[in-house]
Regions:
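Low-complexity, polar-biased intrinsically disordered regions enriched in Pro/Ser/Thr/Gly
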Residues: 112-113, 231-237, 261-269, 486-510
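Conserved ATP-driven motor cores of ASCE-family P-loop NTPases powering translocation/secretion/packaging/pilus
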Residues: 422-424, 428-531
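Intrinsically disordered low-complexity regions specifically enriched for long asparagine
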Residues: 33, 482, 517-521, 620-622, ...
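P-loop NTPase motor domains
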Residues: 121-126, 133-430, 445, 520-541, ...
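Basic- and hydrophobic-enriched, low-structure N-terminal and domain-boundary segments
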Residues: 1-150, 154-160, 167, 507-510, ...
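A short glycine-/small-residue-rich loop at the edge of a beta-strand within enzyme catalytic domains
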Residues: 13, 106-109, 373, 409, ...
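Intrinsically disordered, low-complexity N-terminal regions enriched in serine/proline/glycine
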Residues: 6, 47, 277, 292, ...
């Protein structure tokens, strides 16, 4: 467009100069051959005097150029948002698709300076931020798809987390590798957020979530617990086997959650936890195991676990033995004391985000799926707790809107009934953003037509770039068919003629159609652009909004997730029992804690240090050192 403007200016100036010179020359010659030399000047007749002619010509030039510039800047070259070498059709007979015009964009969306926009950021157009207004009737579920390196975090996740914090809304983030916690935890705490991290990469740096505490004696929650665990750990098993396995796990969870005395036999510090379930399942022979719990159910036929245990006990002996053995293998991660610790204490309250503004980060591994069932459990019970709280309110909504940013969606694990959750959570003030790298990832998790239903439940889809054929074809089809004007020119000339002189020239115009975006155009889309599909609107093409342009970006102070010290970890240091020969006093204990704790500098907010269980960092004392004597050690 800049080149076009330059061509218009240059061409107009040159053309005006040539025209003035020609007219002046003609007028001068004509005046010389006139009857009295000056009485009949053709130049004066045409231009009403040279000075007046130049003024008139200049005014006309500025008027024409101004109209052209206005059309280019505010209306588009043709007013249809199309800047390719394509002439849209004059009718809708061949297709109605087109890019969203700027006029429609300004009516349907919030457009302006980032400081004046509080909605969900989609991108920028002509330097203005474009956002989905929060008061829009459309749901706020977003589907984001972009290949690796397409700026999913920089251009969508990070700026929209900043927007949510300005609105005072809670957020739950599936945080691959912990990058979002590292960049945003500190300033969110300064804004008054309750910040927690469920870190499945660095377990010592994770706050604890008592997953078995979600069950209590609720049979429905116990069923969900067993279903989610087995769905994430037992792919490919026969239906009868899965039925027995789920009921054994459900029965043991209910037994531990409801029977304090029995849980105490596991001899753990915190007894009614998932680690106890693992110990009880793997302790003793098969006959001893069955004898113990058959006796419990026989003596208490109204026990909440009776029905589940009966289904397991009704399987054949071989199936019962295999099921118990396999569950022990599936839950072997609880052999790790750190896994037991991060699932045993009630430091993360899943209902709290609906009550007050919270930011929970779930740090996921992008290298293995060992702890994937824990992240799946976390999000499954998060949905349950938030919906239960919302339904208990007079408005049937969360007091504080909750935003779920499910980055690397395929790494979270299976969420039971996710499609139903998408369709029902909007009215409860829960917004879900699903982020993936390519459509095949979603198709594997939700086969058949389910993946299409998932996307259909989101009124806004953002495509940041694609490198796979499936996604590119889907975007091309989603963009639709546009009508185009076809200009056809036919020329004929003698085959042996050395000079190109057409003998026949025909020009005709007709209507045709083409994809608004061909597959190859999706592949080759510039990385700085994104495509936004909004229900009821044409495709909108925007430039990506980099988070560094957001006003809150200057408040970012990076603190690695590995430096977080949860309460259970600090308590474990205080409970540390010395080994033989170890001298314990307050000085050594303080030194031990100091070595394990992160260094708190002026760059870390003191409140962050307090939440991490650290003492205030004193200012270093200034000491004077004299010259070192010969043979004296450098270290005092």
């Amino acid at each position: 467009m800049r080149k076009l403007i330059l061509y218009l200016i240059t061409g107009s100036v040159i053309g005006l100069t040539i025209l003035t010179a020609v007219l002046y020359s003609v007028g001068f010659v004509w005046s010389q051959i006139a009857y009295n030399g000056l009485s009949f000047s053709f130049w004066e007749i045409l231009n009403i005097g040279r000075e007046e002619g130049i003024i008139v010509s200049g005014v006309l030039f500025l008027l024409i150029f101004g109209i052209a510039a206005w059309r280019i800047f505010f209306k588009g070259i043709r007013g249809d948002g199309e800047d390719r070498d394509i002439l849209p059709g004059t009718t809708d007979n061949q297709g109605t698709s087109r890019f969203m015009s700027k006029e429609r964009m300004r009516r349907a969306l919030s457009v302006g300076n980032i400081k004046d926009v509080n909605g969900i950021i989609l991108g920028t157009v002509d330097g203005d931020c474009v956002a989905l207004p929060m008061e829009s009737m459309l749901n706020k579920h977003i589907f984001v798809c972009g290949a690796p390196g397409s700026m999913k975090n920089r251009a969508f996740l990070r700026p929209n987390m900043m927007q949510a914090s300005l609105r005072g809304e809670s957020m739950i983030i599936a945080d691959s590798k912990g990058t979002e916690y590292q960049m945003q935890a500190t300033y969110l705490e300064k804004l008054g957020y309750e910040v927690k991290v469920f870190n499945l990469v660095n377990l010592k740096a994770s706050d604890s979530w008592d997953c078995l505490g979600e069950i209590s004696e609720d049979l429905n929650k116990a069923t969900l617990f067993a279903t989610v665990v087995m769905a994430n750990l037992s792919d490919g098993k026969a239906e009868f086997w899965l039925l027995a396995a789920k009921n054994l796990l459900k029965a043991m969870c209910l037994i531990v959650a409801s029977d304090v005395d029995l849980a105490a036999t596991a001899k753990t510090d915190n007894q009614q936890v998932i680690g106890t379930v693992y110990k009880l399942i793997t302790t003793g022979t098969q006959s001893e195991f069955e004898s113990t719990y058959n006796g419990i159910m026989k003596n208490n036929k109204r026990h909440v676990a009776n029905a589940a245990w009966s289904i397991y006990a009704g399987a054949s002996e071989k199936v019962r033995q295999d099921v118990r053995h396999e569950i022990g293998i599936y839950l072997e991660v609880f052999q790790n004391p750190e896994v037991v610790n991060i699932t045993s204490y009630n430091e993360i309250n899943l209902t709290l985000p609906a009550v007050t503004k919270c930011a929970y980060f779930v740090v996921l591994s992008d290298q293995h799926t060992t702890y994937q069932f824990l992240s799946s459990l976390f999000f499954n019970f998060l949905f349950v707790d938030l919906v239960e709280y919302a339904d208990a309110q007079p408005t049937n909504r969360c007091k504080v809107p909750v935003n779920l940013y499910l980055d690397e969606f395929s790494s979270i694990g299976k969420i039971d009934g996710f499609l139903q959750k998408l369709s029902s959570t909007r009215s409860r003030g829960i917004n879900i953003c699903t982020i993936c790298q390519a459509l095949p990832q979603i198709q594997v998790m939700y086969p058949g037509k389910e993946w299409e239903s998932l996307i259909a439940c989101t009124d806004t889809q953002i495509y940041l770039g694609s490198t796979d054929e499936t996604t590119a074809k889907y975007i091309s089809q989603r963009a639709g068919i546009m009508g185009v004007t076809q200009n056809m020119i036919r020329e004929t000339r003698p085959a042996l003629s050395p000079i190109y002189i057409p003998t026949v020239y025909q020009k005709s115009q007709g209507e045709g159609h083409r994809n608004l975006l061909n597959v190859d155009e999706v592949y080759t889309m510039d990385i700085k652009y994104a495509l936004v599909s909004i229900r009821g609107e044409h495709i909108l093409r925007v430039e990506k909004f980099d988070y560094t342009k957001h006003p809150l970006a200057k408040k970012i102070k990076e603190v690695p997730a590995s430096e977080h010290r949860p309460q259970w970890y600090m308590d474990s240091l205080q409970k540390h029992e010395p080994t033989k020969g170890e001298v314990v006093n307050q000085e050594i204990a303080d030194l031990h804690a100091k070595q394990l704790a992160p260094v708190v500098t002026d760059e870390v907010d003191p409140r962050t240090a307090v939440k991490m269980g650290l003492p205030p960092s004193p200012a270093p004392a200034k000491t004077k050192r004299g010259p070192r004597k010969k043979g004296q050690s450098q270290t005092p």
